[in-house]
């Protein structure tokens, strides 16, 4: 009797695992949940986007954007005074210097007029950037009236103060000149990569 019930238990367990992942989304081998809890806020996956670099379209990371209210309007997301959560799931190794350069270019392209006011806070963010390996994450949580909490591979580094900084930082992906158009499109609910 024990022999017959073991396969049933195994099949049931496998089905339960499969059901548990139905509510998630996948992009280039990265699986993320549809809903997350950030402190007291329940956030919903707005979209997944693939960061590609160079003319060869090298896959760098899959970004997952969580918001309080799903939207296809980047300006509405940026303007919302609600928590936002951006997770970059690296799919290749990236030097910390390259990450810093990407942030500099992103601020320059999407928040140029604000750069003088943001300079010291950008430097604070840059100080926390390190080499990232495939499978590691950078996580940024925008907290209304507080700024952006920065987490490097599961370790909170601190918070860069100011809602103005949080908006300018998220504009790197949601502003008029994202790192690549498909990345922004995916974060706004379109196809990932």
PLM-predicted stretches and their roles:
Residues 182-193:
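Cysteine/selenocysteine-centered motifs that mediate thiol-based redox chemistry or coordinate metal-sulfur cofactors
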Residues 24-78, 113:
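N-terminal secretory signal peptides
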Residues 1-9:
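Bacterial N-terminal signal peptides that target proteins for export
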Residues 19-21:
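N-terminal signal peptide c-region/cleavage motif recognized by signal peptidases
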Residues 157-183:
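Flexible glycine-rich active-site/ligand-binding loops centered on an Asp-His dyad
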Residues 152-154:
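Short strand-turn-strand beta-turns centered on an Asx-Gly dipeptide
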Residues 10-15:
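Hydrophobic helical h-region of N-terminal Sec-dependent signal peptides
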Residues 69-143:
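Mid-length scaffold segments of soluble, non-membrane domains
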């Amino acid at each position: 009797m024990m022999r017959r019930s073991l396969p049933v238990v195994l099949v049931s367990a496998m089905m339960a695992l499969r059901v548990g992942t139905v509510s998630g989304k996948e992009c280039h081998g990265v699986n993320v949940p549809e809903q997350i809890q950030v402190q007291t806020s329940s956030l919903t996956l707005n979209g997944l986007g693939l960061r590609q670099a160079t003319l060869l379209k090298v896959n760098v990371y899959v970004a997952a954007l969580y918001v309080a209210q799903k939207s296809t309007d980047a300006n509405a997301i940026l303007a919302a005074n609600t928590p936002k959560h951006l997770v970059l799931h690296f799919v290749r190794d990236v030097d910390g210097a390259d990450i810093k350069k990407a942030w500099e270019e992103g601020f320059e392209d999407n928040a140029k007029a604000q750069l003088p006011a943001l300079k010291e806070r950008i430097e604070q963010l840059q100080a926390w950037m390190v080499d990232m390996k495939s499978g590691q994450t950078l996580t940024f949580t925008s907290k209304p009236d507080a700024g952006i909490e920065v987490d490097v591979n599961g370790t909170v580094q601190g918070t860069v103060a100011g809602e103005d900084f949080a908006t300018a930082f998220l504009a790197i992906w949601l502003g008029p000149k994202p790192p690549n158009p498909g990345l922004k499109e995916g974060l706004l609910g379109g196809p990932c990569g």
